[in-house]
C-alpha cells in the first residue's frame, strides 16, 4: 500500500512510500511503522512495513475476581487499550491516555510515564521468531532489545482502575506543546531532563525552516507548517552537539529516524 507520511505521521513530515502490509505472523527484514507517532522518516527509507488490521484486537483469555488475562494485537491503538481498561475497571494502563501509538510501538520503546511502563504487566510477546516470555526480555528505560516484528502480546492486569493516578498522569503532560510533533526528541539522561539541557544551551524556540524546538518544552520538535526532514534532522543534531559541548552529555534519541 502507498502511505503519505506528511499526512500519516504525527510530525507531518515525509513523502509517499510503498509500505508492505503484514497480514500474518512472518519474518520481515525492515521497519514496522506502527502509528508513526515517534518516527521521523527520511527521503529514502529502506523496507518499511505495517501490520494488517487483523492485528487490531483485544481478547480476554481468562479472568476471575482478582485479575484479567488479555491478548492484544500490536496494531491496537493506545487510546483503545486505555478506554478498555477504564471501562472494565482495570489497573495498570492509566498512563496510556497520554501516550499515542500502537501496542507494537509502545513495546518497542518500552513506553511509559512517571515510573509506569508497558512492560510492567506483560506476560509474553508473539514475534516473528516465536513467543518470548517477559522474563527473557531485558527491558530498560525506553528500551526493548528485541529487533524483530511484534504481532500480539499478553498481559495480566488486576482490577481497580486508579482514577487519582489517571488524573495525575494527565496533569503531568499538561505542559506539552500542541502542534505536529513526534513527542520527545531525546530520552532523559540519568538524573536530568533533556528539555532542561536544551533550554540551557539557548535552543528553546530555535527554528530551522518550519521546524522548531518548542518554546514551551525544548525537548519537543514542532512542525509549524511544511518542515522538511533536513530541517528537523538539523535541529536534532544541533541540540545534541550543543548539549555535549556544554555539559559532556550525549543525548540519546527517543525519536526513531529511518
UniProtKB/Swiss-Prot annotation:
Its cofactor is FAD. It is found in: Cytoplasm. Its EC number is 1.3.1.98. GO terms for molecular function: flavin adenine dinucleotide binding; UDP-N-acetylmuramate dehydrogenase activity. It catalyses: UDP-N-acetyl-alpha-D-muramate + NADP(+) = UDP-N-acetyl-3-O-(1-carboxyvinyl)-alpha-D-glucosamine + NADPH + H(+). The active site is at 142, 184 (proton donor), 254. InterPro entries: FAD-bd_PCMH-like_sf, FAD-bd_PCMH_sub2, MurB, MurB_C, MurB_C_sf. It is an enzyme of class 1 (oxidoreductase). Pathway: Cell wall biogenesis; peptidoglycan biosynthesis. Keywords: Cell cycle, Cell division, Cell shape, Cell wall biogenesis/degradation, Cytoplasm, FAD, Flavoprotein, NADP, Oxidoreductase, Peptidoglycan synthesis. GO terms for biological process: cell division; cell wall organization; peptidoglycan biosynthetic process; regulation of cell shape. One of its GO terms (cellular component) is cytosol. Belongs to the MurB family. Cell wall formation. This is UDP-N-acetylenolpyruvoylglucosamine reductase. It comes from Campylobacter jejuni (strain RM1221). The gene is murB.
